[in-house]
Every structure is written in structure tokens, then in C-alpha cells.
Regions:
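Acidic/His- and Gly-rich active-site-bordering loop/insert found
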Residues: 2-108, 115, 125-135, 304
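Short Gly/Pro-enriched turn/cap motifs at secondary-structure boundaries
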Residues: 35, 50-52, 145, 177, ...
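An extended, acidic, His-containing surface patch that forms the Zn2+-binding/catalytic region
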Residues: 46, 68-70, 177-179, 234-294, ...
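Short, solvent-exposed loop/turn segments at the edges of secondary structure
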Residues: 57, 91, 134, 164-165, ...
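Short amphipathic alpha-helices in soluble, non-transmembrane regions
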Residues: 75, 317-325
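Acidic/histidine-rich catalytic neighborhood of metal-dependent amide-processing enzymes
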Residues: 103, 109-188
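A short core secondary-structure module
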Residues: 154-156, 209-236
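Flexible glycine/proline-enriched surface loops and loop-helix/loop-strand junctions
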Residues: 182-184, 203-210
Length: 435
């Protein structure tokens, strides 16, 4: 497949430019970055428009269509980022500095790197005269992903479905290589867990804190709940993605408990990442009680981040909560409920990814993953049920365990070698899918 010789350089320079746009969300302020991308794509022959639900926070949609019908391939990304504390960094987080073969800055991994690779690949192809033989290529770059996508992908899919409708979506979520028992493996995010955050409330009786027994302390009633949550392990539940993951690393998935124990014995770090894919997780994160230090609280609240396997809902979450902490002495109220979703594993897109990995890293394998959180892919799956949406940004120079702590962390950076790798993948995929 044809690829410009300077694709890695073009991607690197574009990423540096994107990092220099401060798009920390909130407030986001994605306008300037999106206008820069618009001009690049427009100059290469794409039909481009910016759509906003609020002023200053546009989403970009770029199209390059064939005259004949065919699949719609969407390369998806977002340009907003989380905050960076400059005092914790070795470089200016918005400098896009190139140091030791890596581009540094907020968004270098999440996910201006992927946006740069997708756009650079698309622009290079278009400038070289490539056009789809059938179907269409869409580049969709969203705002507001880091704050729930209310002004981004969610809004686009719900309010402008005809403009972003796609058969195939490639987004963020996986792609870094990792090793297990001598195998090199690249993950592909094919599903995302649901979010069922809840508040657990205990009741007591207020009183003056100088006489502790005069009241009934609601806060201390949370102690056994916290202890129970601390000791709770994930109830392992059969589902296609973790079973395929186990198969890829050569572990028998017949007994999930034995399988997880085997992985933990061989590589504990992999087990830590695998376990959340296999069932409901419950993580207590916030506590509130009395508003005054000298008042025994009559009510105490514990907030718990609950993540549920794709396709399962509130009833299933509540069942696992009751199993973990019992049923008496408290109330549970769900504050946020989002059902996770998935795409099929065996698809032409997965075949394209496997073929690319074999070309670039002979002998390496590919495995599906479940993203413990969620990304913009979930909105596309929800609104377009037949859409196949995967997360894949291939990284060979920086492995999973080096990359993971840098995402949303200090000194976020990405090797230029991986920028070139990813851009080649998107270029190859576009030509293979659309002709």
C-alpha cells in the first residue's frame, strides 16, 4: 500500500502543533485547534464543517466520498484534554517539545497523537491524489470527551446522526504492546463497561460530639461497608472478550477463577488489568457526613464508582452490590447509569488489524479488550447498532505499562516511532477498506 515517506514527520509536527493549543476541559476551548485541522483537511480536498452545541466548542466533520456506494469508515478522535500541573512536569505541558525521540505534552497520548496520525494519514493520501473507490472516509474530531461528551460525540450522534453515521469506527482505547509469557500482544478495544455510580447512605441520630454515646453515629456505620468493599473480589462472569483475551495469551478459559490465578502467578500486572474485564467492580471514592466537627452525624454518604460488564444493567449492578455489602442498614441510590456496549470480535476490521500487526511485528498477536471506562465509541455503537467501533492506536516502542501511568499524568509523551506506526495503520486501513 502506498504511503508518503514523510508520514512520520508530518504526524510528529502536527501533534506538536495540536499540543500547543491549550484545550484543557473545562473549559475546553477547542475552537482554534479545530479551525487549524479544518484548514488542513479543506486544503487537501475534504468537505469540512464545524458543528457546535455551544459557542467556542466545535466538533469537526470532514468527508471524502466516492461516487459509488460502499462502507463509511470513520476515523474518530477528540482534542480536549485533562488539566496538567506544570510544576509536576519536566517540560512545559503545552510546548510539544521533541526530546529523546518523543513528543512531550498534555494530550501526547490522550489523544492528540491519534488525531494527528489520523489527520496526517488522510491528508497525505488526499494530497497524493487518492480518492475512495466506493463509500466514504469521515474524519470526526470531537470536543468535550473528557467531560462526558455532552457537547461532543453524544450531541453529534443524537442531533446530527446523518452527518456522522458510519459502518466502521476507529477510535482510542487500546493498541499498546504488552508481553505475557514470551508473547508480544497488541490489544484492541472492542467493548466498554457500563458506569453505575451510586451513593450508599446510612442513618443515625445527631448529638454533641463531646458526648459520643448521646447520638447514633451514622459515619461509623459505614465502617463495615468499607471493610466489605475492601475485601471484595470481582465475581468472575463469562463473556466473550476476556475469554478471547485468555485464549490469545494461551490460558484455558474453562474455569475463570483458575485462569485468573494462573495469569496472576505468571504476570501479576496483567492480572490487575484483566480482572476488571471479568465482572463488576466496586471502588469507594468519596465520603461525606457531618458539616461540623463537633456534631455527631445523623447521616453519612459513601459514593462508589461501579463499573459493569457491557450489556448488563442496574439490576445486575444492584445484585453484585448486595452480595458485597449485604442488604440491611443502608440505602442505595444510583447517581449515574450508563449501560456499556460492545462490537463483535470477528470482523473484517479485526482482520485488517491482525494483518497490519503481522506486517509490522511478525509473530505478535492481537487480542480483544474491554475498556474499564468508556470513550466516544459508545455513542456511535448506541446510535448506530450495526456500527463496528474499535479502539486501536498501535504502539510498539512504548509498551502498555510505560504508557498507562502517563495518561492524565505528568510528563505525558509518545515516541515518534509510534506516531509513524499509527499513521501507517490508518493509511493502510483507509486504502484497504475504501479502495
Amino acid at each position: 500500500m502506498s504511503e508518503p515517506a514523510d508520514l512520520q514527520l508530518r504526524t510528529t509536527e502536527l501533534l506538536q502543533r495540536l499540543i500547543r493549543f491549550d484545550t484543557v476541559n473545562p473549559p475546553g476551548n477547542e475552537q482554534a485547534a479545530q479551525e487549524y485541522l479544518r484548514d488542513l483537511l479543506d486544503g487537501a480536498g475534504f468537505e469540512v464543517e464545524l458543528l457546535s452545541s455551544v459557542e467556542g466548542r466545535p466538533n469537526l466533520i470532514a468527508r471524502l466520498a466516492a461516487e459509488s456506494d460502499g462502507p463509511a469508515l470513520c476515523l474518530l478522535g477528540h482534542v480536549d484534554t485533562v488539566l496538567a500541573n506544570a510544576a509536576e512536569w519536566d517540560v512545559d505541558p503545552w510546548s510539544g517539545e521533541l526530546r529523546d525521540g518523543q513528543v512531550w505534552g498534555r494530550g501526547a497520548l490522550d489523544m492528540k497523537s491519534q488525531v494527528a496520525a489520523e489527520v496526517a494519514a488522510a491528508v497525505a493520501l488526499a494530497e497524493a491524489g487518492w480518492r475512495p473507490q466506493s463509500g466514504e472516509l469521515k474524519i470526526v474530531v470531537t470536543a468535550d470527551e473528557e467531560a462526558g461528551a455532552v457537547h461532543g460525540a453524544k450531541w453529534l450522534c443524537e442531533q446530527h446522526p446523518d452527518k456522522v453515521r458510519a459502518d466502521i469506527v476507529v477510535n482510542e482505547g487500546a493498541g499498546e504492546v504488552f508481553e505475557y509469557d514470551g508473547r508480544r500482544i497488541y490489544g484492541v478495544c472492542v467493548a466498554e463497561k457500563g458506569v453505575f455510580r451510586f451513593t450508599l447512605t446510612t442513618e443515625g441520630r445527631a448529638g454533641h460530639a463531646s458526648i459520643p454515646r448521646i447520638g447514633d453515629n451514622a459515619l461509623t456505620k459505614l465502617a463495615p461497608v468499607l471493610a466489605a468493599l475492601a475485601s471484595t473480589r470481582v465475581v468472575l462472569e463469562p463473556s466473550p472478550e476476556p475469554e478471547a483475551f485468555l485464549e490469545a495469551i494461551g490460558v484455558d478459559a474453562t474455569d475463570l477463577g483458575k485462569a485468573l490465578a494462573e495469569v496472576e502467578a505468571v504476570n501479576p500486572a496483567i492480572a490487575v488489568l484483566l480482572e476488571p474485564m471479568m465482572g463488576v467492580t466496586l471502588a469507594p471514592t468519596m465520603v461525606s457526613a457531618s458539616e461540623k466537627i463537633n456534631v455527631i452525624p445523623s447521616r453519612a454518604r459513601l459514593k462508589v464508582d461501579c463499573r459493569v460488564p457491557p450489556g448488563l444493567g442496574e439490576e445486575h449492578a444492584l445484585e453484585r452490590i448486595r452480595e458485597a455489602v449485604g442488604e440491611n442498614g443502608y440505602e442505595v441510590e444510583f447517581d449515574e447509569t450508563v449501560v456499556g456496549n460492545r462490537s463483535p470480535i470477528d470482523t473484517p476490521l479485526m482482520g485488517s488489524i491482525r494483518a497490519f500487526v503481522e506486517r509490522e511485528d511478525p509473530g505478535a498477536q492481537v487480542t480483544p479488550l474491554v475498556l474499564p471506562g468508556f470513550s466516544d465509541s459508545r455513542w456511535f455503537r448506541e446510535v448506530f447498532p450495526d456500527c463496528v467501533a474499535y479502539g486501536f492506536f498501535p504502539q510498539k516502542a512504548m509498551d502498555l505499562f510505560e504508557a498507562a501511568p502517563l495518561i492524565h499524568g505528568a510528563n505525558e509523551r509518545v515516541p515518534v516511532e509510534d506516531l509513524g506506526l499509527a499513521a501507517r495503520f490508518y493509511s493502510d486501513l483507509v486504502q484497504e477498506t475504501l479502495g
